[in-house]
């Protein structure tokens, strides 16, 4: 008999919960509906979560699930900057389509005041591992400057994304998060580029 994958079970619960939160609202969603939609059991739900409130801290899980799916389909030969902008665009598209402004604002505010784990900053997340991989690759290819460390560039990228999400929440979602990010993220990340190094190499070969 095949063993039940605990990660899949937990992931099903998380995905179903956020789908329902978006479609009918957090307050209107019940644990029973989450269990039914996720096709799991009451025992499984309470094995992973104390109650519905505990699911509010799982938004980073939903994000990481998206990153894992994108990683499978993204062309690794794509320029590193394009990979970063692609990830950003697809994540923000998902946020617009699956996460309410109110719940995102609630998550960001609780992360500011919590005395417990700040899930968004957990360096073991798929998010941070993928960013480190892409940025390291960008430096090795000469696409990104080596004047900043990989860790610093990862921090700046994550900071830019959080700033955009915070502003979107602050303004009540009055604009397209994805479209606005497409306009400003290239500017935010321009310091990553190794343009000066490329120019120097060209001059030396002439």
List each model region and its residues.
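Amphipathic C-terminal alpha-helical segment
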Residues: 93-97, 133, 137, 154-175, ...
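Amphipathic alpha-helical packing segments from all-alpha helical-bundle domains
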Residues: 68, 115-141, 151-155, 159, ...
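N-terminal intrinsically disordered/low-complexity leader segments
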Residues: 1-8, 196-206
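Alpha-helical DNA-contacting segments of helix-turn-helix folds
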Residues: 49, 56-63
């Amino acid at each position: 008999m095949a063993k039940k994958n605990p990660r899949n079970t937990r992931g099903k619960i998380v995905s179903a919960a956020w789908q329902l939160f978006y479609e009918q609202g957090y307050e209107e969603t019940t644990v029973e509906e989450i269990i039914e939609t996720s096709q799991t059991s009451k025992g499984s739900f309470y094995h992973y979560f104390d109650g519905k409130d505990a699911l509010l801290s799982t938004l980073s899980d939903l994000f990481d699930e998206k990153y894992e799916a994108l990683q499978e389909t993204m062309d690794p030969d794509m320029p590193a900057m394009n990979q970063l902008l692609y990830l950003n665009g697809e994540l923000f598209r998902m946020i617009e389509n699956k996460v309410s402004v109110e719940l995102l604002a609630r998550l960001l505010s609780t992360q500011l005041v919590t005395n417990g784990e700040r899930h968004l900053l957990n360096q073991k997340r798929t998010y941070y591992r993928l960013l480190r991989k892409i940025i390291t690759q960008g430096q090795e290819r000469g696409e990104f400057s080596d004047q900043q460390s990989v860790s610093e560039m990862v921090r700046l990228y994550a900071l830019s994304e959080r700033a955009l999400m915070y502003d979107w929440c602050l303004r009540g979602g009055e604009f397209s998060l994805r479209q606005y990010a497409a306009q400003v993220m290239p500017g935010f990340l321009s310091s990553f580029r190794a343009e000066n190094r490329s120019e120097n190499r060209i001059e030396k070969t002439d």
